[in-house]
Regions:
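N-terminal signal-anchor transmembrane alpha-helix
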Residues: 1-59
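Hydrophobic alpha-helical transmembrane segments in multi-pass integral membrane proteins
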Residues: 48-59, 105-122
Length: 162
């Protein structure tokens, strides 16, 4: 990531915020439905900032978007298979065996930190940055597909007190 330091700080803050927003999934505690939108949006925003920054500017790479599309489909399948309990009155939900949202945010943050730390230590090359960008695009797309499927399913799930 050879962009401005401001963008580097922005990307790190976005990734750490995504991890904090996904923490209720790890603790298996009920959380508001709107909170499902936060981790994918934050990870996707950080990924788009990284993809837009020079030297790579990979926004026009069809291979990247193809891999992201496949990851989104897999995320949608995963979201369809996650067990959930919904309190329709308060709009809160509880996910069963769905801790990957938090861990995806952690892995994405580690990828960004690895990219940030690898650059000053030596010339790693553009292939490492491209691998990080591809990994982030895959993780963000998976999370977007997963959480979109959960939100859509939660609207039709019968009421359960939480």
């Amino acid at each position: 990531m050879s962009g401005l330091p401001v963008f580097s700080v922005l990307v790190v803050v976005l990734m750490l915020s995504a991890g904090a927003a996904a923490l209720p999934e790890l603790r298996r505690s009920p959380f508001p439905r709107w909170r499902l939108a936060m981790p994918p949006l934050l990870v996707a925003a950080a990924t788009l900032v990284l993809l837009y920054l020079p030297p790579s500017n990979d926004l026009r790479e069809p291979q990247l978007w193809t891999a992201a599309l496949v990851a989104a489909v897999l995320g949608t399948v995963r979201g369809a298979l996650i067990g959930l309990q919904v309190d329709q009155n308060s709009g809160r939900l509880l996910l069963w065996r769905a801790r990957e949202g938090f861990w995806i945010a952690v892995v994405a943050a580690l990828l960004v930190l690895g990219d940030l730390l690898a650059e000053p230590l030596g010339h790693v090359g553009a292939s490492f940055s491209q691998a990080v960008e591809l990994g982030l695009a895959i993780l963000a797309s998976f999370l977007i597909g997963r959480n979109t499927a959960i939100v859509l399913r939660s609207r039709d799930t019968p009421h359960g007190d939480l």
